């Protein structure tokens, strides 16, 4: 039986389109609101859900996601709380893939074996751990693969031909190409260079290649979808949520809708672009 991730990409290929991968922070602005956002994303057009694990020192993240993590931590969100939200999401949705994205420290503190067992039990499909290089695969990557969790690796504009095979060696699910050197949400990618980079990665792997960092609009999503298997959007969704909060950072009646409205625009852009990889 194919994994949820594999089935999602296969379904998108059958529909001649790329997938939309959305990122939101677990616990932002509070656990219950983040769960409501998570539940609403598939209906708005999200194909794969990245759910951020809040951490006090998110070195790869820009101001928007850093602030989201701090709001989540202030609201009391934890690794255990994040897994509980995934478990509750799974009670009503058994088909949409959920990928946890974050840093190794909270997982290590929780306990690797305990974390992997609890993640599988909750219904997590994969992990993106941005600060674990391939040289440390024995720490988490290989144990995760052994539990049936996809371990999704990042490739960047500075990942050269010598480095790329090591990055891809134990990658599963899909490859996440970071289209901009630096932190999230701070610039707009050069779409021509992105297509060239995706083509280069595809020469080394049959895994789907998704592209993120700097995607803010439906037009951006459409431009990237033309040359990639998927488009990732995170900071723009976090910003949409923040703009909907009141002056004290509390959610309003339209907070979930503020996120899903943008997701619908992004999904329309992705779907308008046609297939990202020839069948």
Swiss-Prot record:
Keyword Lyase: yes
Pfam families: Trp_syntA
InterPro entries: Aldolase_TIM (IPR013785), RibuloseP-bd_barrel (IPR011060), Trp_synthase_suA (IPR002028)
Catalytic activity: (1S,2R)-1-C-(indol-3-yl)glycerol 3-phosphate + L-serine = D-glyceraldehyde 3-phosphate + L-tryptophan + H2O
Active site (record annotation): 50, 61
Alphabetically ordered keywords of this record: Amino-acid biosynthesis, Aromatic amino acid biosynthesis, Lyase, Tryptophan biosynthesis
Any GO MF annotation of the entry: tryptophan synthase activity
Cellular component aspect of the GO annotation: cytosol
SUPFAM superfamilies on file: Ribulose-phoshate binding barrel
Superkingdom to which the source organism belongs: Bacteria
E.C. number: 4.2.1.20
Pathway: Amino-acid biosynthesis; L-tryptophan biosynthesis; L-tryptophan from chorismate: step 5/5
Keyword Lyase found: yes
Family, per entry: Belongs to the TrpA family.
Subunit comment: Tetramer of two alpha and two beta chains.
Function per UniProt: The alpha subunit is responsible for the aldol cleavage of indoleglycerol phosphate to indole and glyceraldehyde 3-phosphate.
Record protein name field: Tryptophan synthase alpha chain
């Amino acid at each position: 039986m194919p994994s949820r991730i594999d089935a999602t990409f296969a379904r998108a290929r059958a529909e001649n389109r790329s997938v939309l991968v959305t990122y939101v922070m677990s616990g932002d602005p509070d656990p219950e609101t983040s769960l409501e956002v998570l539940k609403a994303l598939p209906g708005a057009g999200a194909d794969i859900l990245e759910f951020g694990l809040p951490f006090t020192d998110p070195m790869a993240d820009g101001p928007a996601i850093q602030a989201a993590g701090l709001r989540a931590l202030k609201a009391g969100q934890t690794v255990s709380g994040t897994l509980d939200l995934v478990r509750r999401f799974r009670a009503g949705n058994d088909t949409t893939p959920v990928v946890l994205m974050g840093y190794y420290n909270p997982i290590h503190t929780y306990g690797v074996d305990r974390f992997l067992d609890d993640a599988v039990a909750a219904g997590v499909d994969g992990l993106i751990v941005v600060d674990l290089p391939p040289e440390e695969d024995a720490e988490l990557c290989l144990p995760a693969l052994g539990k049936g969790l996809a371990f999704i690796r990042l490739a960047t504009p500075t990942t050269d031909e010598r480095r790329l095979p090591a990055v891809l060696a134990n990658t599963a699910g899909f490859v996440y190409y970071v289209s901009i050197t630096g932190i999230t949400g701070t610039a707009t990618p050069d779409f021509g260079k992105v297509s060239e980079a995706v083509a280069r990665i595809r020469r080394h792997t049959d895994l789907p290649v998704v592209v993120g960092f700097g995607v803010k609009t439906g037009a951006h999503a459409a431009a990237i979808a033309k040359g990639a298997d998927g488009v990732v959007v995170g900071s723009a969704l976090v910003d949409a949520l923040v703009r909907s909060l009141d002056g004290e950072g509390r959610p309003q009646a339209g907070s979930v809708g503020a996120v899903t409205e943008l997701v619908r625009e992004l999904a329309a852009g992705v779907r308008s672009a046609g297939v990202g990889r020839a069948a």
